[in-house]
Amino acid sequence: MGQIQLTDLTKRFGDTVAVDDLSLDIDDEEFLVLVGPSGCGKSTTLRMLAGLETPTSGDIYIGGDHMNYRVPQNRDIAMVFQDYALYPHMTVRQNIRFGLEEEEGYTSAERDERVVEVAETLGIADLLDRKPDELSGGQQQRVALGRAIVRDPEVFLMDEPLSNLDAKLRAEMRTELQNLQDQLAVTTVYVTHNQTEAMTMADRIAVMDDGELQQVASPFECYHEPNNLFVAEFIGEPMINLVRGTRSESTFVGEHFSYPLDEDVMESVDDRDDFVLGVRPEDIEVADAAPDDAALDDHDLQMDVTVVEPHGDQNVLHLSHPDQPSADDALQAVTEGMHLVTRGDRVTVTIPPDKIHLFDAETGTAVHNRRHDQEADFTQLEQ
């Protein structure tokens, strides 16, 4: 069984705390992605799990067995790195077979048969007699995966395996890795700084910052129900809009606009007064400018379009308050690609009250997340 349990795991390098009291349970056959900025401790966590680093304190269990003092080859894991680390003088067949050389219980014929089986699974059976310098980057990555898969481990550990590929190949390999993980039914821990990889591949995401675990949840929850400001900012592209302000009775007051808070939000704020209001760019509604401020509803703003970023299927609009082009509470909004807006246009911006997030300005903790009680928020495929 590939269940993993990390308990109070800490790693120090001198006075630097790389991983700080991390506890995490990973289910058998789960695809968990460790994500965070450079230096957050995600790769150090993976290396401790692999046995390449020794924890300063805390415990590691795989399949219920204590692993702290086991060498890597006795942990029933396989690791794939950012660098493919293929032997240039060996063929693809020999590179994959190398992962079996130290494994007991195989005859030579069985090893050869297993190599072919893995190569067919990865779609590289026709490349078995080529050498690495005859392969593309994507093909080399498949060979590196094959060398890990051939041993049939309980756990895959992957440290940014797609970062050397171009955008098109990364997208293809994301799909291949998901299909492969489903097919092999193996527990996978995948490290990346790329939140797109995390969102598209993970069963659950573990978000780290400064050596600490910030949130462990499904991609949906991390995006729509972030625990704190860090998760809200790190997950999502374009980034969430964040506006600092204070509460005056039932109104959020920012530097350049005020926003009435409805009863549902007010139930969450307690006696706090300083907040950060958040709204995702795609949740902002953009329409033609109202004739005057009197025509605006309570949750409407008049704003100017300062930049338009066309993406084909959508446009990313940069919006500023009139006469305040560099204000800190400028916003970004996402509109449909056929919604034609040009730089300099004045528009009416609506921030729906059921789509806002509210964070404690001092601690960064989420006080209120957007609601999901409307059927329009969800589309479910018929079974």
From Swiss-Prot:
Compartments, as annotated in UniProt: Cell membrane
Known catalytic reactions: D-xylose(out) + ATP + H2O = D-xylose(in) + ADP + phosphate + H(+); L-arabinose(out) + ATP + H2O = L-arabinose(in) + ADP + phosphate + H(+)
Key words of the record: ATP-binding, Cell membrane, Membrane, Nucleotide-binding, Plasmid, Sugar transport, Translocase, Transport
Identification of the protein by name: Xylose/arabinose import ATP-binding protein XacJ
GO MF annotation list: ABC-type D-xylose transporter activity; ABC-type L-arabinose transporter activity; ATP binding; ATP hydrolysis activity
Family as reported in the entry's similarity comment: Belongs to the ABC transporter superfamily. Carbohydrate uptake transporter-1 (CUT1) (TC 3.A.1.1) family.
InterPro entries: AAA+_ATPase, ABC_transporter-like_ATP-bd, ABC_transporter-like_CS, ABC_transpr_MalK-like, ABC_transpr_MalK/UgpC-like, Mo/tungstate-bd_C_term_dom, NA-bd_OB-fold, P-loop_NTPase
EC numbers for this chain: 7.5.2.13
GO CC terms, sorted: ATP-binding cassette (ABC) transporter complex, substrate-binding subunit-containing
SMART domains: AAA
Binding, ATP: 36-43
Bilayer disposition of the protein: Peripheral membrane protein
Subunit structure: The complex is composed of two ATP-binding proteins (XacJ and XacK), two transmembrane proteins (XacH and XacI) and a solute-binding protein (XacG).
Expression triggers: Transcriptionally up-regulated by both L-arabinose and D-xylose via the pentose-specific regulator XacR.
Keyword flag Transcription: no
Domain spans labelled ABC transporter: 4-235
Key word Thylakoid present: no
